[in-house]
Amino acid sequence: MDVPALVEQAREGRPRAVARLISLVEGASPQLREVMAALAPLTGGAYVVGLTGAPGVGKSTSTSALVGAYRTAGRRVGVLAVDPSSPFSGGALLGDRVRMSEHASDPGVYIRSMATRGHLGGLAWAAPQAIRVLDAAGCDVILVETVGVGQSEVEIAAQADTSVVLLAPGRGDGIQAAKAGILEIGDVYVVNKADRDGADATARELNHMLSLGESRAAGDWRPPIVKTVAARGEGIDEVVEALDKHRAWMEKHGVLAERRRARASHEIETIAVTALRERIGDLAGDQRLSALAAKVADGELDPYTASDELVAGLTGR
């Protein structure tokens, strides 16, 4: 496969090329390294927004509404909808365009579902690479919608420039969000389904929780709370405005560059740990491991020292 040609086609906005590149990184193709090397100098221009929240708060509807708002403003949009994996096929349960079919024919929108494959953080393990593909393909904004199953969703903060936490009235979402720890990661909070009873109370509860223990210095970002009815498009422009303000604030204070460096560090660590696991997995039956195991079993060596020796042998340190 001609990777440079495929990357060039993706830069031109050809959906099939984008899809092929994402499939290559998602499937851990032997050409993965070549693909990532070709993409690296083409990335950094897209604004990555993560959307998370409990099931039923309207994440998909909100994502679709945001896509519409960004397209009206002339921005190219990429969407990664991270879905639960099917225990039978290992694929995403929901199709790429099932929930956002109104945008399927828009050449300025690329939508892709990715399976979590059991990853505890809710994000597909290949999501960071897929974000790079969409970035290189010229997307101005990339929306990453995660599974939303509780505490594990905190990982979205490691992948997004801005994290949006969605809640809905009458669900005790404020309390649940506090328990799950996602109140600590939100840059913008959205109370969706605001036409229902209890929306104002939910917003007040959320505001109270955010203010508890708050000790922000002058000029620090204070997460806004926006009420929406995404199904009717109400409040979506206000969400976009809040996102634009947060991006401007981050750029002014150097926070955006700092977050992206942290994201790159997290990605490097993940790749390195995965590589070490694979090398350790290859040691089954290896004489070094067998010899160390025998010493530990005989009480000649403790398992921590044995582990240090094993790692030193793998890394050459």
Predicted regions located by residue number:
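Nucleotide-state-sensitive switch-loop elements of NTP-binding domains
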Residues: 2-49, 54-57, 63-152, 156-174
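Flexible active-site lid/hinge loop adjacent to a nucleotide/diphosphate
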Residues: 169-197
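Generic beta-sheet signal
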Residues: 80, 166, 191-192, 228
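Generic secondary-structure signature for well-ordered alpha-helical cores
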Residues: 12, 23-30, 41, 72, ...
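Canonical P-loop GTPase G-domain recognition
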Residues: 188, 194-249
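Short hinge/gating elements
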Residues: 4-7, 114, 189-191, 224-229, ...
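Long, well-ordered amphipathic alpha-helical subdomains in the mid-to-C-terminal portions
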Residues: 227-230, 238-315
